[in-house]
């Protein structure tokens, strides 16, 4: 085992593999996914890896190549741990508390400028980008392990690209959609918010 290598745990959510596909496990094993466990959540296939590699990026990319080489109809929909996290999950990953996360979010603790939530589930559960939260934590001296930030950014990029490909037909069908969206000012506002967040991080880093 190389000194630079470690075991990385991650999971692929798959489409195109059904519980009755008896040959799927053997095909994945022969394609180099012998460090993965295939299971099902209902009819959704989950492929969990414990892969030895120098980095999470190297581990995930080699696993993606393995799934492709298996010759199945499998499509990787998402890589977990997902970028979307609740306050409880942020607390778990940081060793903080839900109350502490709430105080960061509301600006009552820390330097402020905590990333805005990306979505909500129901009336009370907010969801954030872990990549944005990890970057904020690192920039403000609350997270010492730079690998956590790098891994969070990598997973966010991977899932963004998978989603872009998955939903490409929604915008491809209407070539003027992006232009119409641009005219609302929403994209410009998002670029402004991103730029401001980057400046805030640079200023406190």
List the predicted regions and their residue ranges:
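A short, Lys/Arg-enriched interface patch at domain edges and termini
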Residues: 130-191
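Polyanion-binding surface elements
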Residues: 79-106
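Short glycine-/aliphatic-rich beta-strand segments at the starts of folded cytosolic domains
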Residues: 2-16
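Major-groove DNA-recognition helix of helix-turn-helix-type DNA-binding domains
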Residues: 96-126
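Short amphipathic beta-strand starts and helix->beta connectors
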Residues: 1, 29-35, 70-72
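Short amphipathic alpha-helix segments
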Residues: 15-36
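Helix N-cap motif at beta-to-alpha junctions
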Residues: 17-19, 52-56, 131
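Short, intrinsically disordered low-complexity segments
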Residues: 34-70
């Amino acid at each position: 085992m190389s000194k630079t290598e470690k075991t990385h745990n991650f999971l692929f959510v798959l489409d195109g593999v059904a519980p009755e596909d008896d040959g799927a496990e053997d095909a994945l094993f022969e394609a180099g996914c012998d460090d993965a466990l295939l299971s099902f959540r209902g009819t959704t296939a989950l492929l969990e890896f414990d892969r030895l590699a120098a980095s999470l990026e190297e581990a995930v990319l080699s696993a993606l190549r393995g799934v492709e080489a298996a010759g199945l109809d499998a499509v990787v929909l998402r890589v977990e741990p997902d970028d979307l996290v609740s306050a409880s999950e942020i607390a778990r990953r940081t060793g903080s508390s839900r109350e502490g996360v709430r105080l960061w979010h509301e600006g009552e603790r820390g330097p402020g400028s905590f990333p805005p939530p990306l979505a909500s589930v129901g009336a009370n559960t907010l969801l954030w980008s872990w990549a944005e939260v990890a970057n904020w934590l690192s920039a403000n001296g609350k997270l010492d392990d730079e690998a956590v930030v790098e891994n969070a950014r990598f997973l966010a990029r991977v899932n963004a690209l998978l989603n872009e490909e998955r939903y490409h037909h929604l915008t491809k069908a209407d070539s003027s959609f992006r232009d119409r969206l641009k005219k609302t000012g929403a994209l410009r506002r998002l670029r402004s918010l991103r730029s401001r967040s980057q400046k805030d991080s640079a200023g406190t880093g």
